[in-house]
Amino acid sequence: MGELTHFNKQGRARMVDVTEKAVTHRRAVAAGEIRVSPETMVHIKNGTLKKGDVLAVAQVAGIQAAKHNWELIPMCHPLPLTGIDITFALSDSPCMVEIQAAVTCTGVTGVEMEALTAVSVAALTIYDMCKAVQKDMRIENIRLLSKSGGKSGDYQIKE
């Protein structure tokens, strides 16, 4: 188990100094799901919700979330992201939208939080777009699938 790096000697929160870290290519992929009713899935597929195209809006929201992650998560650094790709897969059994975000940069710290934030905000946006027809949607299973680059090495989830 690694040590916690976001605390100073007094045990108080700090932003880690990354000045001396090597610049490397970083990539992280995160995923999550939002479970919806069959009726809501029909609306998503047919584009019949009053707020507009659910997946198009969620895609832009996820991209924006990754870009602004450092403003939301206190100890995250602002990063020069070089790529953000949000994809969706629709499933009818069970009814859900699967969300995946891949984020890349060349920098001194990883992009895991950016990928996780992108998935989270995309799911929240789907909820917002669909809440007029369903209130009991469930956002589930948000997780890091993989990361590469950096001192701690590569990671791949074991599913």
Region spans (language model):
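C-terminal binding/interaction regions
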Residues: 1-55, 60-77, 82-159
